Amino acid sequence: ARLENAYLGKTFKLYDGTEITFNEDNFRRMVLVYIDAIKYTINIYNSLLKSCGRNIDFEMSIDETLTPTSPESHYFVASELIKGGVEITSLAPRFCGEFQKGIDYIGDISTFEKEFIMHVKIAKTLGYKISVHSGSDKFKVFPIVGKVTEGEYHLKTAGTNWLEAVRIIAARNPALYRRMHKFALENLEEAKKYYHISADPSNIPDIDSLADSELPALMDKDDSRQVLHITYGLILKAKNQDGTYTFKDEIYSTLHKYEQDYYNSLINHIGKHLSGLGIK
């Protein structure tokens, strides 16, 4: 009853006059989807985090839902968290289109921009930043993110730093890369239990047909990028029968040996992200 009295049939104005209205259909659905997560978050924040004795950045992620986050759902979740005493630093909605691991944005750019603008308006009104998850390599939308937020955002990008490491391994230790590549393909189905990707292994050339000099270019192709991306945990944890690591130690020793190469690759890679976001 409290939620119905607070939202149902009500209209809320954002800072620029844009209105958000809750009707019976969309309201009941969003309560069913989000209320348990909201209650759990408020409990964790107030019982564990609030008393930790230091400043924290608190981010709420609602991007793992099956459908994009509507403006009404975004407003409802954030409003309820704030009423529950949660100080939100950033919130990650699920945007339209697909933010798959390791590759560029898939979807209609104009629709994304329209919906992103609305999410930013809500965040500015309620006092936190918008967060973009799986933000690595989403070059098509970076200019929109940088411009619309005026630099106030959180972009999660780390996974493709691993792919730059894989690129260095492919160039400097091709024998190790070949083993990693075959292992990744063999264990792809296990990794796909945790990540949604569109990679098609049949589009990846047979590695035994490639010369060593051709291996680094596999990190420029979407299918092989995604396969090596989502299997990183399996690759690093894999062990031999005697308990030694199958790949991990050699990966680290290779990267230590060619540390400057890896740094240069990261400077170029992250530089592309910063440039796309309008950061100079």
Where on the chain are the PLM-derived regions?
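Catalytic alpha/beta active-site cores
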Residues: A1-V31, S47-L48
